[in-house]
Amino acid sequence: MDRVNLRMLAAIALSSAVCGLAQPAENAENKVDARHVIGLDNVRRNSTGLLTIRDGGLQFQGGKTTVKLLTASIDDIAIGTETTQAGGKAGTVAKTAAIAAPYDSGAALSILLRTNVDVLTVSNRDSSGGLHYAILAVAKGQGEQQRSQLITAGAHVAAPSGQDLKEGKSAAAEMPTAISTKLSASAIQIEPMGAGDVWIPAEFRAAMYEFLVMRVRQSGKFQQVFRSGDRAAANVHDLLTLHTTVEKFKQGSQMQREITTVFGSTKVGVDASVTDRDGHVLLAQRVQGKVLFFGENLGVTNDLAKHIAKRLKQE
């Protein structure tokens, strides 16, 4: 494919991006273009829509689906950043062309197809006390504005932890000794990922939790999968609990991965354990997730959740 055609594809992709997350919507209701990463019930992952703060809640409307989180249910809001693909379907077509193109021109097009976005992570509770994280990508600079508006509307935020943590690997810790037994319980409760003494962005921890809930449910291993804090779990006599703690974290670069195919990988290692009601450790394992080539950095959490869900199903 020649350079002229590559330039045309890039122009189409970037034009689409300008109409999408690259620019906030301008109207009286302060609607903002957003992409749903994960966490909203009945909303497809990576679907796009309009984000509005109105009538005491955060509303996401995509196509015929509208979901609203009441500000009173929100207990924390975090802002992160991500580098993602611009241009929607046009961007996908252009990126495919870049792969087939000569190395130098394909790499240049990959750079043009990158755009930085804010990642809005909204922690909230359902009517049963279950913990949810809604993760949304918005145009750069819109995340803090949405956070401020939600706080003004009555949303709660947690105080800063004050921890001075660094990306890397935690101090070596021994895995707990697990009882050799099959996991035959009818239900399991998923707890949010603990950071330990490793720095990891809030959106990674939140996405890990949401993907774990989704993947463990899809595995069919347990009749019931409860979210952290769900009061209904208290009535299950054989309830198990899944704990995860970050053991190491390396945030790579999506653009570097796609240009070089060698460098820029994102990796997360966690210590995963399953305990019974008496606190006995039934399963303990160190698991690693990674994104080596295509995909946003947050994709590492989905990979990690797949590995853990598969391990649980084998027991």
Protein language model features and the residues they cover:
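Bacterial N-terminal signal peptides that target proteins for export
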Residues: 1-10
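Bacterial N-terminal signal peptides
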Residues: 9-18
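A structural "domain/chain start" motif
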Residues: 22-48, 160-218, 251, 284-289, ...
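Phosphoinositide-binding peripheral membrane targeting modules
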Residues: 54-96
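Extracytoplasmic/secreted envelope proteins and their assembly/folding machinery
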Residues: 55, 71, 143-147, 151, ...
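Second-shell loop/turn segments in exported
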Residues: 62-64, 132-138, 193-203, 259, ...
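Acidic, Ser/Thr- and proline-rich intrinsically disordered linker/docking segments
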Residues: 78-168
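Surface-exposed short loop/turn segments
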Residues: 81-117, 228-278, 295
